[in-house]
Every structure is written in C-alpha cells, then in structure tokens.
Design a protein with these regions (language model features):
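Glycine-biased low-complexity/repetitive sequence motifs
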Residues: 1-225
C-alpha cells in the first residue's frame, strides 16, 4: 500500500513485490530514504498434555534507518546505513510466517528473512516442544525460548544472528535445572523481542521480549515483539 504524510510517501509491503522509483530528486539528500525491514517471527513449540507447554518463538529481526530529511521519531535501534535510491525497481522480500508446533513433542519452524536494498533481517528462532525433554531455543533475529523438562538448564536461542549493528534482536529465555519444584517442573521460556530478552522459565505464563516502536508509518507502531 502507498500512503502519504505531509511531503512523505510511505510504501508498505506485507508480501513480496517491487519498490519502484520512477524519478529521483535533483536535491541529493532527498534521494536518501528511510526504511524499516522486519522479518517473520519463529513459531512456538508444541505443548504438552497438561503437564507442560512449548517455548515461545523469537521475533523477526528489526532493522531501521532514518533519513535526515524525514521528520519522524525513529526507534532506539535506528541504524547508520544510508541507502540512496536511483530510478529503478528494487525487489522486496517479505518473510513468510513460521509454523508453530502442531502437537506435543513437535517443534516449530524458524521465521523467514525479509530484505530490500541488500538489507536483510533474519527470521526469528523457533520455540521448542514440551514437556518430553528440554531443548535449547533456536537462534535468529531474536532467539526462541528454551523448553523445560529433563535434563533442564537449557539456553534460549541467540538473537542478532547473524550479527549486525545495531542489533536486530535479543536472546530467548533460559530454563532452570531439573527436577524443579513440582509446579514448575516443565516450565518453558519466552522468545526474545527486538527490545528485550524473553522471560526465563518459571511457574505461570512466560512473556516474550518486548518490541520497539517507530513512527516511520506516521504514527507509533511497535514491531518485533
């Protein structure tokens, strides 16, 4: 979709396509554009039979650049890689959503890459199934949470994988030792978000990491949570 805000034109892609620049400006700084690239998140792991749930998938990678001539409030993760466009078509890749674990003891899939202008955001790491055996979360833009159970002491997937600066995401949460107190023996962890790590395994629901907000679409929206 294409919308306008003041003198700015905002192109939003929710699927693959082509960003077409028909004509550039005679003023060079106006050809440096703002962009936001967000990948798809990882799926959540399959749950158990009432004794334990799967861990959360990590958020897709988040990468943003704000042109000096674009008047909006950027996220805390705004980067420093400018793109100067010319009159041509730029392929857009939007990562398809991941699959969650469909049943107990079934893992999810990782998220998928989104890209434009050679700027790529990594898909989120998958969550793992519970409760039959603990596993480490998968790495990705943000990492998937670790799952609980025996033998325990599992690690959330690493975020910002592959590494970029500023970071595109954070780690998934970890799980504790086995056996744990009965109420938390199978607790799994939350996936990471662009704005913070996933919550470690504990009794009760585990939260995923928070996203980050940007006004690149002319109003504040939180992404990659």
């Amino acid at each position: 979709t294409v919308t306008e805000s003041g003198n700015c034109r905002i192109h939003t892609f929710t699927g693959p396509g082509t960003f077409t620049v028909a004509q550039t400006s005679a003023t060079a700084p106006e050809n440096v554009i703002s962009y936001l690239v967000v990948a798809s998140g990882g799926g959540g792991g399959g749950g158990g039979d009432g004794s334990g749930g799967g861990s959360g998938g990590g958020a897709g990678g988040f990468r943003e650049f704000k042109s000096p001539v674009t008047p909006y409030t950027a996220s805390p993760l705004v980067g420093s890689t400018p793109i100067t466009v010319t009159a041509q078509g730029y392929p857009v890749v939007v990562g398809a959503g991941a699959s969650g674990g469909p049943a107990a003891s079934v893992n999810a899939t990782n998220g998928n890459v989104s890209s434009i202008f050679g700027i790529s955001s990594a898909g989120g790491g998958a969550g793992k199934h519970g409760p039959c055996g603990s596993q480490n979360g998968e790495p990705g833009g943000s990492g998937g949470g670790a799952s609980g159970g025996n033998p325990g002491c599992r690690t959330g997937g690493s975020g910002n994988t592959p590494p970029v600066s500023p970071v595109q995401g954070t780690n998934g949460g970890n799980t504790g030792s086995f056996p744990q107190p009965p109420a938390s023996v199978y607790d799994s962890a939350g996936g990471g978000g662009a704005g913070g790590v996933g919550q470690n395994g504990q009794p009760g629901p585990r939260a995923g990491g928070p996203g980050v907000a940007t006004e690149i679409t002319a109003s504040p929206v939180t992404y990659a949570a």
